[in-house]
Regions:
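N-terminal pre-domain/capping segments
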Residues: 1-100, 157-161, 187
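Short aromatic/hydrophobic contact patches that present stacked aromatics
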Residues: 8, 104, 217
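Active-site beta-loop-alpha junctions enriched in small/polar residues
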Residues: 10-14, 38-42, 71-74, 107-110, ...
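Short, flexible segments with low predicted structural confidence
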Residues: 12-13, 30-31, 123, 171, ...
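Short, charged helix-to-loop "capping" segments that act as catalytic/coupling loops
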Residues: 16, 127-129, 135, 172-176, ...
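Active-site acidic/histidine proton-transfer and metal-coordination neighborhood
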Residues: 21, 58-65, 76-164, 171, ...
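Short, hinge-like loop/turn segments at secondary-structure boundaries
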Residues: 26-27, 53-55, 84-87, 121-122, ...
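Gly/Pro-rich active-site loop or hairpin
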Residues: 46, 79-82, 145-149, 170-236
Length: 236
């Protein structure tokens, strides 16, 4: 396995209808080094009758690891639901169990930079040693890298960082150009997600459906993957 940057298949890429061991086997056979796991998918594994020790044994059996944990949402709500509070704690537990350093997070609700930064600061304090990776998504309250960096910068937390995703990048109409991230230190980018997009996007009202169900493999869409990777490499 790559010591620092394991090649990981995201949890949603493998859907939510397969058993845990089938998920691990599929990722292994496809050449991935690790799997991402959503809190919901972890709960599904427990619902299969597996315990934490069984999950770890399956991973060890196939020489795989969980290398990504997600997904904390609604973290900027003034009054968070118990479901979201519990999901957040579950993500912390998963990081401890699988020795994962970061949690992917998104925010659908749209608030000011100042308010969002304050709520991100509170989340980072709760996360402690774990990195909070903020994922800009064009249909969300943090639609692009510009607002994403403004929020992370204003939060001023060592464990607040950003995620770059090819699909979200293109659908946010951001040019694949270093100028977009020129003010963002390279060490504030915690994860790079590589995929591809169709030339014509879904309608704005259903853009999230495309994000969830109709992405393309790297290099099979409009051809931005190589340029995106080159940009990331040049950034350092």
């Amino acid at each position: 396995m790559s010591k620092e940057f394991p090649i990981t298949i995201s949890s949603w890429t493998l859907g939510d209808q397969c058993k845990f061991e089938d998920r691990v086997i599929a990722a292994k056979n496809a050449g991935y080094e690790g799997i991402g796991l959503r809190a919901e998918t972890y709960v599904d594994s427990l619902n299969e009758g597996l315990f934490d020790k069984d999950i770890l044994a399956i991973l060890d059996k196939h020489g795989m690891k969980v290398t990504e944990v997600e997904y904390i949402a609604q973290w900027a709500e003034e009054h968070r639901s118990y479901e979201q509070k519990y999901k957040e704690q579950l993500c912390f537990h998963m990081c401890e169990l699988f020795d994962v350093k970061q949690i992917n997070c998104g925010l659908m609700e749209n608030y000011s930079v100042e308010y969002t930064a304050q709520k991100l600061r509170e989340l980072c304090q709760r996360a402690g040693k774990y990195i909070i990776g903020i994922e800009p998504m064009p249909y969300s309250g943090i639609p692009d890298m510009k607002k994403g960096w403004a929020v992370v910068k204003a939060a001023d937390c060592e464990n607040a960082k950003l995620i770059m995703d090819t699909w979200h990048w293109v659908r946010a109409n951001q040019p694949v150009d270093l100028s977009v991230i020129e003010d963002i230190p390279a060490d504030k980018i915690v994860s790079i997600q590589i995929n591809d997009v169709w030339e014509r996007p879904y309608a704005t009202t259903i853009l999230r459906d495309e994000s969830m169900h109709d992405r393309l493999a790297p290099g099979t869409g409009i051809g931005c993957t190589a340029a995106f990777v080159k940009m990331v490499k040049e950034k350092g």
